[in-house]
């Protein structure tokens, strides 16, 4: 799959700058948090880069792009490099207070992996589900990208204080030994 149209991505990022979607800025980096509907081209590129990055470590969906139904209604936090006009990394983040009323427990990606007892439903309403995180290869050895994404998580929790919990699944690459994975 070809990369998303860069001019359209830049236009979407510029619109986000004019709204309340920028969480933070540090030198040439900006971290944004927004809905999928506001970033169709950026989201396409997130899906493409997610697949490329996961394949590089023996993971991935084996599809041309890694997007699923959850990407359409989850929020996306992404790290934008102003110097290169590209996405350096991203997280998918679902706000439980929005997901649960619309979709119930079935609306959470984690429900595909685990069975949630009804006693946990209130917790899920007050949770931010995180996942599908990546940093593209060119930025993985740089000190700031991971730090800024984590700082973006902090800013998100401050912006949405009704969410008391962060949760999500973690994939551990098969490149690690069984001992390391245990």
Language-model segments: what does each one mean?
Residues 69-71, 148-149:
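Short, glycine/acidic-rich beta->alpha junctions
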Residues 13-21, 64-66, 114-120:
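Intrinsically disordered, low-complexity boundary segments flanking structured domains
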Residues 61, 98-182:
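Acyl-donor binding region in acyl/amide transferases
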Residues 91-97:
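Short beta->alpha transition motifs characteristic of CBS
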Residues 1-37:
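Conserved N-terminal entry element of GNAT/NAT acetyltransferase domains
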Residues 2-6, 36-47, 143, 147:
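Generic detection of long, well-ordered alpha-helical segments
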Residues 23-66, 72, 76, 80-89:
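Short amphipathic alpha-helix that is part of the acyltransferase structural core
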Residues 71-72, 165:
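A short amphipathic beta-strand at an alpha->beta junction
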